[in-house]
């Protein structure tokens, strides 16, 4: 994964690459998913902090931090609300393969830049507040996806009903079956039942509130819902956990209102959330460098 606020060889700051995703519709009552409408409306680069935005900062909010350019890499299509789709897509997003968003650069090395931070966006119910999720869950996905399918994976304890495999005298048959068993082993076997973002969620919330209109209801949530929102979040957290990488990812739940006004509000809040995430990580890196 790229380094936050690292420098190029010429001394200039490298841009911070932030992956953004949104979901496709999944309910008859909500034929338009505001998470995707917000995501696709975002610019390619995070705009500079405007003076009028800065005036919304309360006295309890952390001061703005000088940050390098921030490139927003929005996934080019809404993600289907389907377990298999998400299962296959998430590793490609983080590892720069397949459908990973392109930076649009001409150089080959710029086509699939490494992701420094990620923000998955999903729709909640008809509520008026916006919430960032602290944790994702490994199990409990009992609802059908948009295609009427259940999550086909089984928890680890169900996969290990019998560890003793038959073995022929020459050992070849047993070796083959052992190999097949390992291939079929649950992808999340051995992982914690909950994984938390490595971002300082409280600090991100303070900064997000500081950059946003004071009347907006912005919160931290402890339960992403154990549906596709939770599933994609845990998928990212688990992929990074297994790779030994910093879990620099958050999930944002937005209201279900997909009106033009609501999408415009959501767009601005997402931009300020990304700013808050980047500021928090840049400040953390600075503290680490000076040994605070």
Locate predicted features.
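N-terminal catalytic or cofactor-binding beta/alpha core of small enzyme domains
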Residues: 1-224, 241-242, 255, 264, ...
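Active-site-adjacent mobile loop/cap segments within catalytic or ligand-binding domains
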Residues: 226-279
């Amino acid at each position: 994964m790229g380094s936050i606020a690292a420098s190029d060889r010429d001394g200039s700051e490298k841009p911070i690459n932030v992956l953004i995703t949104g979901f496709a519709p999944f309910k008859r009552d909500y034929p338009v998913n505001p998470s995707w409408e917000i995501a696709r409306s975002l610019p390619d680069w995070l705009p500079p902090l405007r003076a009028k935005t800065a005036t919304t900062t309360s006295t309890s909010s952390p001061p703005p931090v000088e940050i390098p350019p921030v490139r927003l890499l929005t996934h080019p299509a809404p993600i289907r609300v389907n377990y298999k789709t998400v299962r296959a897509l998430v590793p490609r997003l983080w590892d720069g393969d397949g459908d990973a968003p392109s930076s649009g650069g001409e150089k080959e090395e710029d086509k699939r830049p490494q992701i420094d931070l990620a923000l998955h966006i999903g729709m909640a119910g008809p509520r008026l507040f916006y919430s960032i999720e602290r944790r994702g869950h490994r199990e409990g996905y009992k609802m059908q996806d948009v295609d009427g399918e259940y999550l086909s994976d089984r928890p680890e304890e169900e996969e290990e009903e019998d560890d003793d495999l038959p073995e022929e005298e020459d050992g070849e048959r047993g070796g083959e079956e052992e190999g097949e068993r390992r291939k079929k082993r649950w992808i999340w076997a051995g992982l914690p039942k909950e994984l938390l973002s490595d971002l300082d969620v409280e600090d991100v919330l303070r900064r997000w509130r500081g950059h946003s209109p004071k009347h907006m209801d912005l919160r931290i949530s402890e339960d992403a819902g154990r549906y596709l929102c939770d599933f994609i979040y845990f998928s990212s957290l688990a992929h990074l956990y297994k790779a030994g990488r910093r879990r620099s990812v958050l999930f944002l739940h937005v209201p279900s209102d997909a009106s033009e006004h609501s999408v415009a509000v959501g767009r601005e809040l997402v931009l300020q959330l990304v700013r808050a995430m980047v500021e928090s990580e840049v400040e953390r890196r600075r503290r680490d460098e000076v040994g605070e």
